Amino acid sequence: MKLSNCNTRTPRAARGFTLIELMVVISVVAILTTIAVSAYRTYVRRTTRTEARMALLAIQVAQEKFFLQNNQYAQSLATAIAAPPAGLGIQLTAGGQTLGGHYTVSFTAATANTYTVQAVAIGTQTADTAACRTFRIDDQGVRFPLDSSGCWR
C-alpha cells in the first residue's frame, strides 16, 4: 500500500501572486496615473488659452469695424457686448467673462483713438503658467505676453 504525501507543495507558479508583488504593481500604476493626470491638466490649461486669444482677437476685429463706422473705438465693456451698430456684439457674459468662464475680459486705457483690452485668468485657469495668465492686445496689434513665451500659440 502506498501512502500519499500530504505535505506535497504546489509549484510556486500555480499559487498566485504575493502581497508584495501586488503592492509593487499598484504602486507602479499609481505613479503612472499621477504623471498622466498632471500632463493632461497641463494640456487642458494650454488648450483653454484659446478662449482668451479668441475673445481678444474678436474684439480687435470688431473694434476696427466699429472705428470705420463711428470714427472712434468702443471704450467700454458694455459697448463691446452690445449688438451692432451700437456695439461690437462680442459674446461675453454681463460680467465680462468669456463663455467658457476661464477669463475675465476688460478694457484698459481706452480712448476714442486707442484701446487696450485684456483677458485675465480666473478659476482653474489661474493654475496656468504665470506668463500666460494675462493676455493683452492694443489698437496697434501689440500682444502681451510676447510670443516668445508661447502663450499665443
Residue ranges and their predicted role:
Residues 1-17:
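N-terminal leader/signal peptides at the extreme start of proteins
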Residues 19-22, 63, 119:
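Conserved hydrophobic beta-strand within the GNAT/NAT acetyltransferase core sheet
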Residues 20-30, 49-58, 85-91:
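Short, charged low-complexity linear motifs
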Residues 14, 43-50, 54, 110, ...:
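Residues at secondary-structure transition points
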Residues 12-43:
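N-terminal single-pass transmembrane signal-anchor helix
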Residues 44-72:
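Membrane-proximal N-terminal amphipathic helix
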Residues 2-3, 68-153:
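Periplasmic/extracellular, small/polar-rich flexible segments of pilin-like filament-forming proteins
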